[in-house]
Amino acid sequence: MASRNQNRPPRSPNAKKEGLGGISFDKRRKVETQGGTGRRQAFSAVNKQDVTMNSDVGSIEECGKVDFTKDEILALLSERAKAGKFDTKAKIEQMTDIIKRLKVCVKWFQQADETHVQEKENLKVSLESSEQKYNHKELEARTKEEELQATISKLEENVVSLHEKLAKEESSTQDAIECHRREKEARVAAEKVQASLGEELDKVKEEKMAAKQKVTSLEDMYKRLQEYNTSLQQYNSKLQTDLETVRAALTRAEKEKSSILENLSTLRGHSKSLQDQLSSSRVLQDDAIKQKDSLLSEVTNLRNELQQVRDDRDRQVVQSQKLSEEIRKYQENVGKSSQELDILTAKSGSLEETCSLQKERLNMLEQQLAIANERQKMADASVSLTRTEFEEQKHLLCELQDRLADMEHQLCEGELLRKKLHNTILELKGNIRVFCRVRPLLPDDGGRHEATVIAYPTSTEAQGRGVDLVQSGNKHPFTFDKVFNHEASQEEVFFEISQLVQSALDGYKVCIFAYGQTGSGKTYTMMGRPEAPDQKGLIPRSLEQIFQASQSLGAQGWKYKMQVSMLEIYNETIRDLLSTNRTTSMDLVRADSGTSGKQYTITHDVNGHTHVSDLTIFDVCSVGKISSLLQQAAQSRSVGKTQMNEQSSRSHFVFTMRISGVNESTEQQVQGVLNLIDLAGSERLSKSGATGDRLKETQAINKSLSALSDVIFALAKKEDHVPFRNSKLTYLLQPCLGGDSKTLMFVNISPDPTSAGESLCSLRFAARVNACEIGIPRRQTSTKLLDSRLSYG
């Protein structure tokens, strides 16, 4: 259908008024369009002429094929008969020809007018449909405006209650002003939403065209999926058989583990009793050694005394012999007096008496020496017996220690086998794995002196996998894939997920995210303190393992290319943490008001990869490069102070590494993705005391976490529609939660009794996540060149 501008003659600015009573063509055109009857009556005299020529009829029938320009119409209207004054026949012929052309022109105008009328009707219909759509959009806008008004009224009620509580404080006026400003912003936002509805209408039309194109591609994909489904059914039957085998092996492993644990406990008891006996034997040995030393010293003293007595006796005997010799000489010597003889006799008697006393003492010392020697022999025999028993006990202890080491080694191997079988079962079931970690009590915790609310089961089945929370006297038991108590180190935590991180190098999509209330230790678990080697978090340790493993696989012909990106979702706005243009506080204000200069868009391609437009991507080849990027991202991330946490994360942090591996010898290529996510913590306004910007951040965080909860509940119920688009966080995590990825969730809880309610909510959410079956992850391998663009899974 020709448009109105195409049928309208062009207007010349130099055209003068001429013909038909001096009325210009444009004016006459305007008058004619006001009523159809007036325009048709203008040439009624011409139309009533009795023209019966066949050529006239043919000309009128062919008028629809003739187009007139403005100059031709003006020339036709100004044309006059050129015949002589008395040449009536020629005048009639000329007038007849002019009338024919005028009829053709009139017919052309009538058809153009009909075209315009039809176009007008179409425009009316289009206008009515547009008005209906506009009314519908306006109704939606009014509904949203009413919701915003309800939110505003709730906020006003909160302000009134706060005003009553804080009437004596000077900050009440500022709170009222802040509330009024939020009300104005909400109204402005409602107006913007109303204005954006028109733009959304255009987008819907564009999406409709794109949907038609997708339908064609989806039909082709459906055929391929049918073929793939057949192969999957065959593979599933094989997996079911393997699953039964694995379950039987797991049962045997559990029984062997139970018997090993029983033997281990028996051996530990026997070892403890032997250690007690060894300790008592060592005490007896020490006493015997001390007694032996005292006896040896006593024997030495007695021997010295005996030797001294013997020496004295020998001197006395020699002296007695000398005196006897002198007596004999004196007796022979007649010249000596009897007095001297008596003196010598007395001396001899005293010496003999002293000698007898010395003999008695010597006999006594010999008896004591014999007794001491006997006691020494007995002590030597006791020490020898004790030493023999000690050697036997030591040998038995070594044997028990060797058996204990063997049992512990078997236990470790059994535990590794159990983990491997458990991971295999989980992969076959397609469940999201959940680990729970309890942080230690801090000096600032309010319930530090109250009774503990966290307990760990000691049964064989639940040991290391169960956690009990006590609230208001009620015990709530939970079981997860692994539970870390408050004494668990960063190394122990990473050891449990190291095999999952390794899967990214094998071509799988891996996603690990931390969930919990604010201040429960999520950021410490994911990032830790990189400056302290023993306190590094999962992200630095995962990167170190990936680079070490890639270097080891280099000997097998593998070459890897790694790309990283880091972003945060702050107030439902994506921010690039590695952008060279550092975001300022004014940019944050513009981002809050929805006027940010740079917008990032999340898209999913047909291969299941997720891309974020205009996101900064770095090629990395060392841990040092990534460490500097992590430090840059940590400095750019949004943090703030609340009453619950001095350094509270106010955004969701997403670290992504895409790994592309090529083995030239086998011509095999793999493509893996590692997503490590530190979610912002949920918090209650009554405890965090958030106001102003902190209040907006809290509302945005709780909204996105609520959207994540809705997605998990929909997956758990196996609903047809899963609301991934309700927030940017869930839309970004769609591939990770959609069944094509190995996904692990860390739920962090606080042992503080004042946070028992939040901890219970977190544990219940984690239990629901653990029950979700999202499908079996697939390994991304190919023999073609890979796309080098970064994706999020």
From Swiss-Prot:
GO terms for molecular function: ATP binding; microtubule binding; minus-end-directed microtubule motor activity. Residues 120-375 form a coiled coil. It comes from the Eukaryota. Disruption phenotype: Plants show defects in male meiosis, producing an abnormal number of microspores of variable sizes. Dividing cells of mutant plants lack spindle bipolarity in metaphase of mitosis. Kin14c and kin14d double mutant is gametophytically lethal. Residues 1-69 are annotated as: Globular. Residues 431-772 form the Kinesin motor domain. Residues 15-32 have a biased composition (Basic and acidic residues). One of its GO terms (biological process) is cell division. ATP binds at G516, Q517, T518, G519, S520, G521, K522, T523. It is found in: Cytoplasm, Cytoskeleton, Spindle; Cytoplasm, Cytoskeleton, Phragmoplast; Chromosome, Centromere, Kinetochore; Cytoplasm, Cytoskeleton. Residues 1-43 are annotated as: Disordered. GO terms for cellular component: cytoplasm; kinetochore; microtubule; minus-end kinesin complex; nucleus; phragmoplast; spindle. PANTHER family: KINESIN-LIKE PROTEIN KLP-3 (PTHR47972), PROTEIN CLARET SEGREGATIONAL (PTHR47972:SF45). Kinesin that supports microtubule movement in an ATP-dependent manner and has a minus-end directed polarity. Plays a crucial role in spindle morphogenesis in male meiosis. In mitosis, is required for normal microtubule accumulation at the spindle poles during prophase and may play a role in spindle assembly during prometaphase. Composed of three structural domains; a small globular N-terminal, a central alpha-helical coiled coil and a large globular C-terminal which is responsible for the motor activity (it hydrolyzes ATP and binds microtubules). This is Kinesin-like protein KIN-14C. It comes from Arabidopsis thaliana.
